[in-house]
Every structure is written in structure tokens, then in C-alpha cells.
């Protein structure tokens, strides 16, 4: 059963005047009728502009090459899919029977496309400045962490590439504990990696940070062990 839509809009930080726009943004092309690809096209362009503009302002002395690499890191599919999981977007997607059966609600590409479509929907429901402020709020932590010239691959990406290069299955991340009040929570995540006897534990102030911490530890153990 789909959770109440107000839970999603609360996580997004935006309440739609036209709820049909949000419904359309959540509708994959595998479902019959109208779908989210036009909104995705629009949202992709808005996201790219907003992130480019923010990087230009934040890093006045950084060259075009570094800014392009930072933008690519922030707007790539797996970053958008991470955002989608933070919003529990998979619980709200409207998919056709085939995609539902094959677990499309967990697929990175479908989650990433839906995030872009939601950005397009927010823009159409409001204006560019509102869409910009929402996107920058979503990206606040990532923008604070990103640095020019540094490796733009986060620990989860590096762990995934390490395992893929050795033809091993991808790691599985599970939230095992959340403690504290909503504004001051600590997440504990277990990361299961093929070939490691016990799951690796990571902690952080968000699910994403806990997963990254677990991936970093797993990488250290795999490369040093």
C-alpha cells in the first residue's frame, strides 16, 4: 500500500498546488498513459543549471575543468538515486506490472529519473527560484563536502567499482538502528560484502553518511587484508 503523499512532500520540502504534477513525476513509462519523461527532460536541465550556478558562486577561483567534474559528480545517476532513496521514492513510484515484478522501484535509473522529474514538476508548479532553493536544500550536505581537485568518487562508488572489477556482487546496506530526535539522529548501517565474514558497521547523522562510513571501512579492510 502506498504511504500518504504528505509524507513524501514533507521529505521533499515542497507542497504542490497541482498534485497531478507530482503524480505525473512519479509515473514511469512502463505504466499505461502519461508518464514522467518530459518532466525528467525539464528537471535534468534545471538541475544542471542550478548546480553549475552554485559551484560558480562557491568556487570563484576554480577552473572550468574542476567545476565540470564536480557538477558531473553531483548530478550523476547514482547521486540522484541516493536522493531518491532518502525520500523513500520507491514507495510512491507508479510502475507497470513488468517493472514492478523485476523490482523497478529499487533501480537506480528509475529513481534518478523520478528525482529529475520531480524537479521539473516543482518548477512548473512554482518558479525557477523556488525550484533552485529546493534543489540546494536537497544538496546542502553534498555541496558542503565536495572539493575541487579531490577524487570525486565517494566511498560507496569506490567500493562498488572495487567489487565489480573482481566480478563480485554489489554490497547490501541495511539500516540497523536509528536513535535520537528527528533533528539530531544517529544512523547505524550494516554493509554486507561478499567474501567478508561479518557485516561492516558505519554510523552517521544521516543514512547516506552512515552508508559512506561503512563503505569506507569495508574498502580499508578489503585493500589491507
Swiss-Prot record:
Belongs to the ribonuclease III family. Its EC number is 3.1.26.3. It comes from the Bacteria. Its cofactor is Mg(2+). It is found in: Cytoplasm. Gene3D superfamilies: 3.30.160.20, Ribonuclease III domain. Residues 154-224 form the DRBM domain. One of its GO terms (molecular function) is double-stranded RNA binding. Mg(2+) binds at residues 40, 113, 116. It catalyses: Endonucleolytic cleavage to 5'-phosphomonoester. Residues 5-127 form the RNase III domain. This is Ribonuclease 3. HAMAP family: RNase_III. Its main location: cytoplasm. Keywords: Cytoplasm, Endonuclease, Hydrolase, Magnesium, Metal-binding, mRNA processing, Nuclease, RNA-binding, rRNA processing, rRNA-binding, tRNA processing. Digests double-stranded RNA. Involved in the processing of primary rRNA transcript to yield the immediate precursors to the large and small rRNAs (23S and 16S). Processes some mRNAs, and tRNAs when they are encoded in the rRNA operon. Processes pre-crRNA and tracrRNA of type II CRISPR loci if present in the organism. Homodimer. The gene is rnc. One of its GO terms (biological process) is RNA processing. It is an enzyme of class 3 (hydrolase). The active site is at 44, 116.
Amino acid at each position: 500500500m502506498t504511504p500518504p503523499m504528505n509524507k513524501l512532500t514533507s521529505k521533499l520540502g515542497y507542497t504542490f498546488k497541482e498534485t497531478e504534477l507530482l503524480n505525473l513525476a512519479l509515473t514511469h513509462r512502463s505504466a499505461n498513459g502519461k508518464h514522467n519523461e518530459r518532466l525528467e527532460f525539464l528537471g535534468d536541465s534545471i538541475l544542471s543549471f542550478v548546480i553549475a550556478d552554485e559551484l560558480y558562486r562557491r568556487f570563484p577561483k576554480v577552473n572550468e575543468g574542476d567545476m565540470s567534474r564536480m557538477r558531473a559528480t553531483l548530478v550523476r545517476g547514482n547521486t540522484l538515486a541516493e536522493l531518491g532513496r532518502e525520500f523513500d521514492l520507491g514507495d510512491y513510484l507508479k510502475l507497470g506490472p513488468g517493472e514492478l515484478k523485476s523490482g523497478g522501484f529499487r533501480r537506480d535509473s528509475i529513481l534518478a529519473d523520478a528525482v529529475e522529474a520531480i524537479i521539473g514538476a516543482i518548477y512548473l508548479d512554482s518558479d525557477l527560484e523556488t525550484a533552485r532553493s529546493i534543489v540546494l536544500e536537497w544538496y546542502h550536505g553534498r555541496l558542503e563536502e565536495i572539493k575541487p581537485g579531490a577524487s570525486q568518487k565517494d566511498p560507496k562508488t569506490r567500493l562498488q567499482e572495487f567489487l565489480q572489477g573482481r566480478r563480485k556482487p554489489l554490497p547490501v546496506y541495511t539500516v540497523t538502528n536509528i536513535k535520537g530526535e528527528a533533528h539530531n539522529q544517529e544512523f547505524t548501517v550494516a554493509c554486507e560484502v561478499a567474501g567478508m565474514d561479518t557485516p561492516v558497521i558505519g554510523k552517521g547523522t544521516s543514512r547516506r553518511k552512515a552508508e559512506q562510513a561503512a563503505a569506507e571501512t569495508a574498502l580499508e579492510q578489503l585493500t589491507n587484508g
